[in-house]
Swiss-Prot record:
Enzyme Commission number(s) from the entry: 5.2.1.8
Alphabetical list of Pfam families matching this protein: FKBP_C (PF00254), Trigger_C (PF05698), Trigger_N (PF05697)
Domain PPIase FKBP-type: 174-261
Any one GO MF annotation of this record: protein folding chaperone
Location of region: Disordered: 430-472
Protein name: Trigger factor
Keyword annotations from UniProtKB, A to Z: Cell cycle, Cell division, Chaperone, Cytoplasm, Isomerase, Rotamase
Annotated compartments: Cytoplasm
Protein family per UniProt: Belongs to the FKBP-type PPIase family. Tig subfamily.
GO cellular component: cytoplasm
Known catalytic reactions: [protein]-peptidylproline (omega=180) = [protein]-peptidylproline (omega=0)
Top EC group: isomerase
Biological processes annotated in GO: 'de novo' cotranslational protein folding; cell division; chaperone-mediated protein folding; protein transport; protein unfolding
Gene transcribed to yield this protein: tig
């Protein structure tokens, strides 16, 4: 279909959508109808006729005028859309939707008469910033906490501990208790689903199980049995258990504890690649300092971008929101796959729908941040020189293995994105006012811990356990 013969008008719609109205002339509607008959006559199989040789009148009689009109209309709408976006140099980012529906258009469609079609599609928005300079933002500072070094060393000692049996004393906090237990709800005596076990290793640490459970076990001796009263928290994951009181019949079948290695140079060699405890401490200190600096930089950037987003005016098209939600879903699936989970069986249609819905706010936020930075680059003329990109690519390639397979175009785009991001953040730092929020405790729990390099030969292994409804 020639675009020159079409009358096309466009109208912006809310949500970054564009309505495209196309008037198809009478001769083209007639041609589309005739083409549909010819196409169907070539494909239809009727007894007594060779394929492709079915007369026109027989085709119409057998298939009916409505089916032929529908076939003609489908082809005509597709062609009109392609010609219209080419003629008007439009760049839709989603498939078009027919305004008023196909059935309504089919009822009014008469071959040989002009027809007006309106289709809608999402288009890329044009983000604007009300202001770029003089933005004010506050960020949470992150300070290095030297005490975390001792905590990390202690965690590493626990990883390398040797599990030994306890003899001659009662259970204490920090022990490993081998328990048999059965739980019932106190209000009606019903058995707690998932609240029982024949033999389960339980770390006697506060917070491991629901309130009252660990406290009830501490002080028991091997062979003892007792009933422990507990209560499920109000925010417990299973709704029917929230806030309910429960009684657990508990038997302490065995008791073990961990013998921790001494903090010395031998421990440092076992826990890391370092030769001495002093070197290990220095490594952990530097790791925590680097982590604190990284997180503070991230906090500063988040605050600046947040202030910039407040100045953003943009309508997010649904197509982009859905695509970003799918990206987040794919990232989640990839993380599960790396953990050895069967993603295909885990990601049921219902779960996918829920994840897509739940990820929508994050998807919208990510899009707003991206559009805000794009608008800033446009408004302030911030760009990256080709020489800088080439130099950075050379640096990156030096760090890659000689036989690494890379896509040159994707690498170049990634480098450009990183460099423009750095320039944009530097510009925001220079042209905004950043203040520190009130100091907060440095939550460095996510900093990497020194993984055990070697496992002690005497360390006992216990089978993996499934979580019960007594666990917090």
């Amino acid at each position: 279909m020639s675009a020159a013969a079409l009358k096309v008008t466009t109208e912006s719609r809310p949500g970054s959508r564009l309505a495209v109205t196309v008037t198809v002339p009478a001769e083209r509607t007639k041609t589309s109808y005739e083409d549909a008959i010819n196409s169907l006559s070539r494909s239809i199989n009727l007894p007594g006729f060779r394929k492709g040789k079915v007369p026109r009148t027989v085709v119409i009689q057998q298939l009916g005028a409505v089916r032929i009109k529908a076939s003609a209309l489908e082809t005509m709408v597709d062609g009109a859309w392609r010609d219209a976006i080419q003629q008007e140099s439009l760049e839709p980012i989603s498939q078009p939707e027919l305004s008023g529906g196909f059935e309504g258009l089919l009822d009014s469609f008469t071959p040989g008469e002009a027809v007006t079609i309106t289709l809608e599609a999402d288009v890329a928005p044009t983000p604007k910033l009300k202001s770029t300079k003089g933005l004010k933002a506050s960020f949470e500072p992150v300070a290095y906490d030297a005490a975390k070094v001792d905590e990390m060393l202690e965690d590493s000692r626990k990883q390398l501990a040797t599990v030994v049996p306890v003899e001659g004393r009662a259970a204490e906090q920090g022990d490993i208790a081998v328990l048999g237990f059965k739980g019932t709800y106190s209000d009606d005596g019903s058995e707690i689903e998932g609240g029982s076990a024949d033999s389960m290793d339980v770390d006697l640490e506060h917070g491991r199980m629901i309130p009252g459970f660990i406290e009830g076990v501490i002080g028991m001796a091997v062979g003892d049995s007792k009933t422990v009263d507990c209560q499920f928290p109000d925010d417990y994951p299973k709704e029917d258990a929230r806030g309910r009181k429960a009684a657990f019949e508990i038997e302490l079948k065995d008791l073990k504890t961990r013998e921790l290695p001494e903090l010395n140079d031998a421990f440092a060699k076992q826990a890391s690649e370092q030769e001495t405890l002093a070197e290990l401490r220095q490594e952990l200190e530097q790791r925590l300092k680097d982590d604190a600096e990284r997180r503070q930089t991230s906090n500063r950037r988040d605050a600046l971008i947040g202030a910039l987003v407040e100045q953003l005016e943009v309508e997010l098209p649904e197509a982009l929101i859905q695509q970003e939600s799918r990206n987040l879903l794919e990232q989640t699936a990839a993380q599960f796959a790396q953990q050895g989970m069967d993603v295909k069986s885990l990601f049921t249609p219902d779960l996918v729908r829920n994840l897509m819905q739940n990820s929508r706010p994050e998807a919208e936020e990510r899009l707003r941040r991206s559009f805000a930075l794009t608008a800033l680059a446009e408004a302030e003329g911030i760009s990256v020189e080709d020489d800088a990109v080439d130099a950075k690519i050379k640096e990156v390639k030096k760090e890659l293995a000689a036989d690494a397979k890379i896509d040159p175009q994707r690498l170049r785009q990634a480098v450009m994105d990183d460099l423009i991001q750095e320039q944009l953040m530097s510009w925001l730092e220079e042209n905004s006012t950043l203040t520190e929020q009130a100091p907060a405790a440095d939550d460095a729990d996510d900093a990497e811990k020194p993984a055990a390099k070697k496992k002690p030969a005497a360390k006992k292994k216990t089978p993996a356990k499934s979580k019960t409804d007594a666990e917090a």
